[in-house]
């Protein structure tokens, strides 16, 4: 007889969180705020942090997103709930009523995941429930001085949940033991589960035959420890241009990022259903921007790996100038493994499945083979502005001797003119160092001067290709009101950052400029699009 198991991955932490008293929940709110993103999910009101329980309903053809949610304030606080939203295309989201809530105001339903129990191993379902909609949530129940792993099941496809009467299903007598991720291991016909044991900085991997009774199989610990581990994820990722795959362990740290605050790291290796063994001890980051944390993947995805993250940073998330909501998610990304300089590296890209035909192209600028000089910049001349743009640029670096300090070009994201001023952020490339960078400092705007809001970040990249002896690079970017996602060299490196222009201002046009008098950069292809939801 084949033993059916669930695999659970849990990190084992030390943080103090504030308390906010309960009040009535009112989701009716004006959503016309000038800097609210259009296609990055934001709650209508209140506070959001980690995405939870991502899954795809194959029967309803619907994506489900749950998230850490405080509807009573725009800062973290208990009682904490699982908020809920759905989408049929990953960019147009409908927010629903709270999915799971705590029993008392000084408690919280902390992060977790959802598994579709097709085979009814839990015994929660009968034949009237579609196998694709047998939804079981496993989450951390945060009560005073204790964190346990509890489960709840849904009989209506994930909109409402009933808590298991014999909770908790895992209790290790710790107040820093959370963020369970459950997944079905097809090869071993098993469910696996992991959690973070924060205080001891390790990931614990459990197995179960019924989602109710769990056995500890192994521990994992590596990489940047930071102050705590959290939000661990273990998933099989395909290798590009092959029929092979490798297992990848994702885990988050906070604080402890080299950039400050929170970040996600990953490890490539093998998993036998019980233990994860990395290929090496090297630390790699999922996204090198300042605002990409608590990464989650969708379960029940038919092809490939699709995931998103919380687009903020614990260093300043509760201070950003948005109202009546705080925080957004990143866009969903497709993940693969690619050999880069003979080493497997995680790559991320947004493709047509994430930016579907339902996104309206309002206007477009398209150019080819432009030799960029200080007398020949590129500028959009779009008639209106939605604050939502994307751009795709492939360029090569010409072999010229240029003056020191004149080895770069910049992409300026400019606001509309308001009160006789224009706010800008810039992305650029320095050919002398093979370095992409972003500068999100905006003079005369208060928030970007916050102590921990690192305004300048950079990334060294090897060329994507060579044209004879000339280096070739590519950059795709998407700008959505107050967030920019950058994908360098076909997704070899991703960088996500929020930015905040002055009151009433948001992105209006894009310029590509350089200081060089002679052409150092040939822009082989430039496509800039103004988009609308």
Swiss-Prot record:
Single Gene Ontology BP annotation: sucrose catabolic process
Enzyme class: hydrolase
Any GO CC annotation of this UniProt entry: fungal-type vacuole
Positions bound to substrate: 47-50, 68, 110-111, 178-179, 314
InterPro entries named among the record's database cross-references: ConA-like_dom_sf (IPR013320), Glyco_hydro_32 (IPR001362), Glyco_hydro_32_AS (IPR018053), Glyco_hydro_32_C (IPR013189), Glyco_hydro_32_N (IPR013148), Glyco_hydro_beta-prop_sf (IPR023296)
Catalytic residues in the record: 50
Domain of life per record: Eukaryota
Key words of the record: Glycoprotein, Glycosidase, Hydrolase, Signal
Pfam family, one: Glyco_hydro_32N
Matches recorded under Gene3D superfamilies: Exo-inulinase, domain 1, Glycosyl hydrolase domain, family 43
Record gene name: INV
Organism whose genome encodes this protein: Schwanniomyces occidentalis (Yeast)
Signal peptide: 1-22
Membership in a protein family: Belongs to the glycosyl hydrolase 32 family.
Glycosylation sites: 72, 119-120, 126, 219, 334, 392, 419
Coiled-coil region: none
Protein name (database record): Invertase
UniProt xrefs under SUPFAM superfamilies: Arabinanase/levansucrase/invertase, Concanavalin A-like lectins/glucanases
Disulfide bond annotation, renumbered to this chain: none
Entry GO MF terms: sucrose alpha-glucosidase activity
Record's catalysed reaction(s): Hydrolysis of terminal non-reducing beta-D-fructofuranoside residues in beta-D-fructofuranosides
Documented EC number(s): 3.2.1.26
Key word Methyltransferase present: no
């Amino acid at each position: 007889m084949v033993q059916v198991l669930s695999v659970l991955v849990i990190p084992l932490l030390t943080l103090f969180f504030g308390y906010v008293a309960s009040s009535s929940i009112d989701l009716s709110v004006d959503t016309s705020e000038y800097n609210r993103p259009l296609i990055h999910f934001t709650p209508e009101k209140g506070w959001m942090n980690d995405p939870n329980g991502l899954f795809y309903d194959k029967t309803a053809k619907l994506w489900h997103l749950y998230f850490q949610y405080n509807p009573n304030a725009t800062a973290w606080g208990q009682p904490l709930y699982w908020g809920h939203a759905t989408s049929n295309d990953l960019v147009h989201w409908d927010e629903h009523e709270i999915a799971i809530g705590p029993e008392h105001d000084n408690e919280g339903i902390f992060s977790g995941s959802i598994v579709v129990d097709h085979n009814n191993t839990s015994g929660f379902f009968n034949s009237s429930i579609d196998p694709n909609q047998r939804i079981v949530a496993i989450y951390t129940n945060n009560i005073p001085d204790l964190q346990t792993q509890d489960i709840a099941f849904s009989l209506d496809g994930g909109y409402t949940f009933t808590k298991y009467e014999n909770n908790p299903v895992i209790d290790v007598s710790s107040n820093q033991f959370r963020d369970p991720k459950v997944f079905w291991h097809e090869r071993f016909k098993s469910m696996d589960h992991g959690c973070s044991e924060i205080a001891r900085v390790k990931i614990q991997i459990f197995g179960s035959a019924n989602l109710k009774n769990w056995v500890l199989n192994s521990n994992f610990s590596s990489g940047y420890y930071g102050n705590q581990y959290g939000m661990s994820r273990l998933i099989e990722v395909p290798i590009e241009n092959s029929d092979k795959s490798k297992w990848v362990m994702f885990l988050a740290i906070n604080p402890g990022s080299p950039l400050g605050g929170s970040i996600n790291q990953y490890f490539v290796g093998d998993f036998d259903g019980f233990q994860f063994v990395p290929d090496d001890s090297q630390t790699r980051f999922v996204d090198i921007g300042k605002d990409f944390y608590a990464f989650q993947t969708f379960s029940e995805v038919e092809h490939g790996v699709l995931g998103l993250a919380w687009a903020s940073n614990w260093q300043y998330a509760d201070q950003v100038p948005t109202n009546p909501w705080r925080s957004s998610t990143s866009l969903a990304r497709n993940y693969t493994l690619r050999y880069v300089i003979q080493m497997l590296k995680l790559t991320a890209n947004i493709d047509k499945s994430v930016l579907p035909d339902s996104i309206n192209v309002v206007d477009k600028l398209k150019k080819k083979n432009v030799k960029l000089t200080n007398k020949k910049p590129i500028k959009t001349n779009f008639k209106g502005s939605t604050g939502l743009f994307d751009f795709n640029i492939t360029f090569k670096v010409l072999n010229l001797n240029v003056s020191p300090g004149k080895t770069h070009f910049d992409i300026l994201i400019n606001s509309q003119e308001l009160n006789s001023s224009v706010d800008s952020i810039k992305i650029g490339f320095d050919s002398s160092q093979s370095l992409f960078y972003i500068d999100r400092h905006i003079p005369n705007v208060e928030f970007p001067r916050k102590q921990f809001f690192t305004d300048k970040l950079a990334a060294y990249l090897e060329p994507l290709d060579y044209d004879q002896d000339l280096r070739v690079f590519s950059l795709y970017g998407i700008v959505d009101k107050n967030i920019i996602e950058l994908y360098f060299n076909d997704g070899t490196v991703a960088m996500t950052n929020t930015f905040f222009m002055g009151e009433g201002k948001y992105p209006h046009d894009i310029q590509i400029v350089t200081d060089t008098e002679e052409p150092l950069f040939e822009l082989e292809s430039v496509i800039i699009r103004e988009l609308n939801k």
